């Protein structure tokens, strides 16, 4: 039977319209979910204890993080603690809040350029030489850029705790899974962390709290039934042993068949059995029995070299020459920069504070990650001029002190007007106007942006939108005199700050 072309066209058109309508509805539903009418400063919701540290997660299901497409965690590493190798499904920025240590990042396809010199000397006597990819030192104030799917580990070789704040950009185009944060562990027993993240994932998928509890109870019942079933216990000894070991081991290597792994690594089955055996609930941060001995550059030598390189970079940038990133190969690209040094500040006011920015121009890898950051300091009662982020969401973490923050949406409603305390997190959506003023003890913060070249538009000051408007437009828009319009435009000579003396004079007037 011949098919009528008109009928076929109408059928295809109907199907296309149906698909388009479904996509449009889904898009509208997603947009409606992100009609933010209220923001909150929040602390971590979950806390997972490991042998030598803790991992804390903010709830990625909360509206402000979900709509920004990010997840945030905080890690505390005790002295001599080792964060076991893992990778994530999304690029991340890691800020060192306190402490110092070493970190290794495994770039796929890159050579092992670090070699043990002592073993090199004894190689002629038959001793094997160890070699591995580059190990970097980190210290307080460093920001480290980690691409998605790249293995990383870290070790606290200092005498104080290391604290990091990690932003995972789950909404990034590089993440082709979903917006649930996923850490793929290659060692250790991340069972508790996985359980907590599964619970948060269930919330993100719209399951009720009662449904989560019933599913957990069912899961526990199945485990008990499996243990009590005699037919299961009668299995062959090796399978039974492997099953018992894997039940307390949740990293990627545990689930693979032992024979396959033995062939893949070209080692004996006993070695694979040791790899897959996890004794005790040590978690994902373990305590090393003896000091970890790996090849690293001397601490002061590397830090001094980094400072010299940064100084040369800034000198060239200020002279009009900007790094284009082409001279950096994938294997040798810089992934770290320190923002804590006051001399590193890009914006500075001796009465108000300073801001240091990090973007794709001074750390080219950020162009790949589509992220950027800033570290800010406000002195006693000083403030940041009202402004908005043109092209990015802003995720602010208070490092020290506190600040009053106001955020205003497109309806002119204040969706946040409160203090952000030390250790709290606040998301400022794209285009929402905001301002902040430090408390009596000042304030320090780190902000992450979901764009590699985040741009702000100040509402007052020397580079503001108000300064760029004609005087007549200001007078007509706000129904003020020409003299008042002139004062609004030109009275604040600062670029991004206002000082406490200015605000006090306005209040007294």
Curated annotation (Swiss-Prot):
This is a seed storage protein. Residues 39-273, 337-486 form the Cupin type-1 domain. This is Legumin A. Disulfide bonds join 34-67, 110-331. Belongs to the 11S seed storage protein (globulins) family. Residues 212-228 have a biased composition (Acidic residues). Residues 1-21 form the signal peptide. Residues 187-248, 298-325 are annotated as: Disordered. Hexamer; each subunit is composed of an acidic and a basic chain derived from a single precursor and linked by a disulfide bond. Residues 299-314 have a biased composition (Basic and acidic residues). It comes from Gossypium hirsutum (Upland cotton).
